[in-house]
Structures are given as C-alpha cells and as structure tokens.
Amino acid sequence: MKKLTYFIHDGKDNYEPLYEYTISNVGIDEFYARQLCTYFIIKGSQYELISNEMDGDDEILVLEDRGRNNSVLDEKSYRGLGIHVEFRRCKESENYKLLTAVPCRTHLDVIRYLLKDIIDVPGFGQMAVTSTEVDEDRGVYVLYVKTIGENDMG
C-alpha cells in the first residue's frame, strides 16, 4: 500500500478525488482504520462510504456526498491530543449525545472498536454499533451506538 485516496461519486459514473493520504504521512494501521469507517467528515461536509477498493498498491474509498455535517453541542476538537474514539448515541432526537470518549495508544486500538458489532462502552456496558465515522475536522473517530435490541430510528 502506498496511498489511500477518497473519491466522490456523483451518481453519474464520475469520480472526483477529494483527499489523499500516503503511507509516509500516516501508518498502515491508520489506513486500515479509515477504511473501516462508514462516514468521513471533512471541511464541514459528510460523506458516506459506498465502496472500498484495491487498485494495485493503492487503496481507494468511494464516497457519496451527504451534504453539510450538522455539528452538535458537545463536540470538541481532539487535534494535537492524540488518537481518540468517541461513543455517541445514534439518535438524532437525542442530538447524538456524547456518552464518553477514550484515548487510544495506536490505530490498532481504534480498529478493535471499528471491527465490532457489539462493544463495551466505558461506564455504559455493552452496546450495539450502528455506524462509524472518522471526523477529520475534529481529529476523532466516532462510534454511534444504541442499547442492544433498541430500534435505531429517530
């Protein structure tokens, strides 16, 4: 792997490059962590992963634009503070309430969370993951969760 490139698909078979990382700038563990996220937030916009592809030594993530990313009251920036994972409620009606955030030593620690359907949320116990994102604007990974068996609509 040499580079990871995000492309935006416009729905008409056109693909525009959005952002690129090289292996010399980020580690391979971060390459993998990013590929496991359902959503990508950058420059105030939200993108949804629709395809994860391999092209020789290159990793390609194809995204669809979901419009402006709506900020919530308890968001904070983790830039310069190391690697962090936030756990938030999946319900818009609850303003995607922050449950807790944990620091991670490496992206391998993040990958452990991203691979799971059920996770232990510190202080809340086991919860079901509904989606994952990397928020480039705030420098944090976010896992949206619900109580096991709970409907995630709303």
Where are each of the predicted segments found?
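Surface-exposed beta-loop interaction hotspot
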Residues: N52-R105
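Short alpha-helix capping/helix-loop boundary micro-motifs
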Residues: E20-D29, T100-D109
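Short, basic/aromatic beta-hairpin or loop at an interaction surface
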Residues: K3-Y21, H84-T100
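Short, solvent-exposed secondary-structure boundary/capping segments
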Residues: G56-D65, E136-T147
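Short, well-ordered loop/turn sites that connect or cap secondary structure elements
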Residues: F31-Q35, I111-L114
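Short beta-strand-centered aromatic/proline hotspots
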Residues: S45-G56, G125-E136
